């Protein structure tokens, strides 16, 4: 039985609210199961929420296939060889599911044994941290459906995994909203924690996903990732760009071989609803669990075994999936969610937050900016900053020097172009790079992020995020070619070409939903010589500066007065967090070296915002040294293995702590810095990690490790030690 420390009255309120919630279809109940004082008696039935469409139910035996590893087991997930597909251009739904789980798990987790996979974490490590000899496969059922608003355009995918070992006597639900712009299995590594705890896992793709609308052939993805024509799919399409046939024909004539992606081109600003979609996943989970337990039939008068008042529900995930979990908790007026445990969350704070961040007693000049603000800033400066001699040994910087995948001198060209545009004052390349790096630090990146900038630039993370989020926030149509960007495959001359048939057929499972991805590139439509891959293009200055024109166009949307700028500014305003978690126990974990979502623009200032507005706050923030945003890079990018520890381990520990608090009343740790030790050694062959490299957070951190928050005169000050 969950204790819900300090929320006894809240539990009674939850019971009283069940009738109202059920009547509206909020949780799929037609009545409530009573409250703690037993003054109310009604007869609940299991009513499918009104927003849920046709439901598909599949059981996995845990031998040939399973919930966590898709039948691959721990060894299969660790293998560098991806699962095979019998017909590469026509994969089955089962093959696509297996590919999706394989690719998404590996994208979020370092699967190298030396990094801790199989010993500190991974499918074969049980809920208590014990290494087992098993494969880690989990038998159980999946319930899958669309959530739609009746338009057939929303079609957000909801999925609930219920392990066969689900404990109805101690029920729990964990949310695992997809990270990034990924598909439904985009937070499978979060789901792993829940499955091991015998919890149900509530997933949603939150209106993103990797399968594109190929405009040239007018084919679209279905819910299971398979593809068909837009006409044949109709309202069952997971995504089809909202275009008339006439518009599509004209667009294809003017800009052939382009693709539309749901996050960028749905014209719905899905981010504003990520909290709502996460709550819908929880509601769907309650219905699915009771449907399974009742054998698919819950007659009137039967008592529902699993209800909000007897079930531990933890909102969780990572990256912007973690931000969605926090949004859900803030928006949860019906008390479905009991606690929050998230990793490296994407959080947009209001400009009026009145929070300042200090590190080592020094107030930082720029903090608490929304994602599009700081990522569009990085999109301009990071490529140049990574050329600074102070970070010459950073992972992937040698790839630029060797012109591997990038034009020669592109970093120096970017520095010079920034100077020509009046954005850098220095006159030599070396000084310009140093100046750009200092600008990054001043705008909120910690010095610990310096060694990550080169790889962020090399993998085009800033232009990909800025372009997709710019389109999404502005509700831009694919027809708009916002800032003259588009998405396409390219030929050997870097010009748009027909997308590879195999890549397209499997893209829903191999891509991340935010180009560049799986053979789809960012295109500069205004490049000299015709539309060209953005990083290879020659822009208006006549140089290959990785399309600075496009980067500056995106940046200007923040302050512009034209229709696109105003639409984007409105879109951002619809995604801002309130900071009020309603007194729920909550842990945020983030790596200090995070260069995608800098700690000074998310977790740190959110702690201050929460302290101002949540009078019964139980939020703690754990900042981990030597940890960055992409655990999947630790084994992928030489040098990451020597520098960084796996953050996934701390995300799982945060879930452990919040669960123990809700279940047993175990106190949460106070906010603190956890000081880890990198593995060191030679880039690409670091020694095996040891438990001593990754100490746990503690309930009694040293004074020098404590993170504190004070509120005075309407301003919250977050103090972080060096």
Curated annotation (Swiss-Prot):
Cellular component terms per the entry's GO annotation: extracellular space
Main location: secreted
Disulfide bonds: none
Keyword set includes tRNA processing: no
Enzyme class: hydrolase
A single GO BP: butyrate metabolic process
The UniProt record lists the keyword Signal: yes
Domain of life according to the entry: Bacteria
Catalytic reaction annotation: (3R)-hydroxybutanoate dimer + H2O = 2 (R)-3-hydroxybutanoate + H(+)
Protein name per its UniProtKB record: D-(-)-3-hydroxybutyrate oligomer hydrolase
Organism: Ralstonia pickettii (Burkholderia pickettii)
């Amino acid at each position: 039985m969950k204790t819900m420390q300090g929320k006894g009255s809240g539990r009674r309120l939850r019971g009283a609210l069940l009738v109202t919630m059920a009547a509206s279809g909020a949780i799929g109940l037609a009545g409530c199961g009573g409250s703690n004082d037993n003054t109310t008696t009604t007869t609940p039935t299991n009513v499918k929420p009104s927003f849920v469409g046709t439901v598909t139910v599949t059981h996995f035996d845990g031998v040939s296939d399973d919930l966590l590893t898709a039948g691959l087991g721990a060894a299969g997930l660790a293998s560098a060889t991806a699962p095979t597909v019998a017909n590469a251009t026509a994969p089955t739904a089962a093959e696509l599911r297996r590919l999706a789980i394989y690719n998404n798990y590996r994208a979020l987790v370092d699967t190298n044994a030396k990094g801790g996979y199989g010993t500190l974490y991974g499918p074969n490590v049980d809920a208590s941290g014990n290494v087992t000899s098993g494969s880690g496969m989990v038998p159980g059922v999946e319930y899958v459906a669309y959530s739609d608003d009746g338009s057939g355009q929303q079609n957000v995918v909801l999925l609930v995994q219920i392990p066969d070992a689900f404990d109805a006597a101690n029920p729990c639900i964990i949310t695992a909203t997809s990270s990034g712009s990924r598909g439904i299995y985009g937070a499978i590594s979060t789901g792993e924690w829940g499955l091991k705890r015998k919890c149900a896992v509530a997933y949603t793709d939150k209106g993103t996903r990797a399968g594109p609308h190929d405009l040239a052939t007018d084919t679209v993805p279905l819910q299971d990732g398979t593809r068909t024509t837009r006409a044949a799919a109709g309202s069952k399409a997971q995504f089809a760009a909202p275009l008339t046939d006439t518009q599509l024909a004209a667009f294809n004539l003017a800009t052939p071989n382009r693709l539309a992606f749901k996050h960028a081109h749905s014209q719905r600003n899905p981010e504003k609803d990520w909290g709502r979609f996460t709550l819908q996943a929880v509601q769907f989970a309650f219905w699915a669990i009771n449907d399974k337990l009742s054998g698919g039939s819950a007659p009137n008068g039967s008592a529902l075994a699993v209800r909000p008042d007897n079930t531990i529900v933890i909102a969780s995930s990572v990256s912007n999936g973690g931000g969605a979990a926090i949004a859900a908790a803030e928006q949860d007026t019906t008390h479905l969610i009991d606690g929050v445990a998230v990793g490296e969350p994407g959080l947009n704070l209001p400009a009026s937050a009145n929070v300042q961040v200090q590190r080592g007693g020094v107030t930082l000049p720029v903090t608490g900016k929304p994602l599009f603000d700081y990522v569009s800033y990085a999109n301009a400066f990071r490529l140049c900053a990574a050329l600074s001699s102070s970070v010459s040994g950073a992972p992937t910087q040698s790839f630029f020097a060797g012109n591997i995948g990038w034009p020669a001198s592109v970093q120096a060209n970017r520095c010079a172009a920034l100077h020509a545009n009046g954005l850098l004052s220095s006159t030599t390349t070396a000084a310009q790079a140093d100046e750009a790096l200092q600008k990054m630090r001043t705008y909120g990146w910690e010095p610990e992020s310096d060694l990550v900038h080169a790889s962020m630039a090399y993998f085009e993370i800033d232009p990909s995020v800025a372009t997709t989020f710019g389109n999404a926030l502005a509700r831009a149509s694919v027809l708009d070619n916002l800032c003259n960007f588009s998405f396409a495959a390219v030929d050997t001359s870097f010009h748009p070409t027909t997308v590879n048939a195999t890549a397209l057929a499997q893209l829903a499972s191999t891509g991340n939903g935010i180009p560049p991805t799986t053979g789809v590139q960012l295109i500069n439509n205004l490049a000299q010589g015709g539309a060209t891959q953005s990083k290879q293009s020659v822009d208006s200055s006549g140089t290959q500066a990785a399309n600075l024109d496009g980067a500056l166009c995106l940046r200007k949307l923040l302050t512009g007065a034209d229709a696109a700028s105003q639409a984007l500014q409105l879109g951002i305003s619809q995604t801002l967090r309130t900071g009020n978690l309603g007194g729920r126990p909550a842990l945020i974990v983030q790596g200090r070296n995070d260069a995608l979502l800098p700690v000074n623009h998310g977790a740190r200032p959110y702690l201050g915002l929460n302290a101002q507005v949540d009078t019964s706050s139980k939020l703690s923030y754990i900042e981990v040294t030597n940890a960055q945003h992409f655990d999947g890079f630790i084994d992928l990018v030489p040098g990451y293995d020597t520098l960084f520890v796996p953050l996934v381990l701390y995300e799982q520990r945060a879930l452990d702590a919040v669960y123990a608090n809700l279940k047993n009343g175990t106190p949460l740790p106070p906010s603190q810095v956890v000081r880890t030790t990198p593995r060191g050694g030679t880039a690409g062959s670091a020694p095996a990690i040891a438990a001593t490299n990754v100490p746990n957070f503690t309930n009694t951190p040293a004074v020098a490790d404590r993170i504190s928050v004070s509120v005075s005169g309407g301003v919250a000050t977050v103090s972080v030690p060096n």
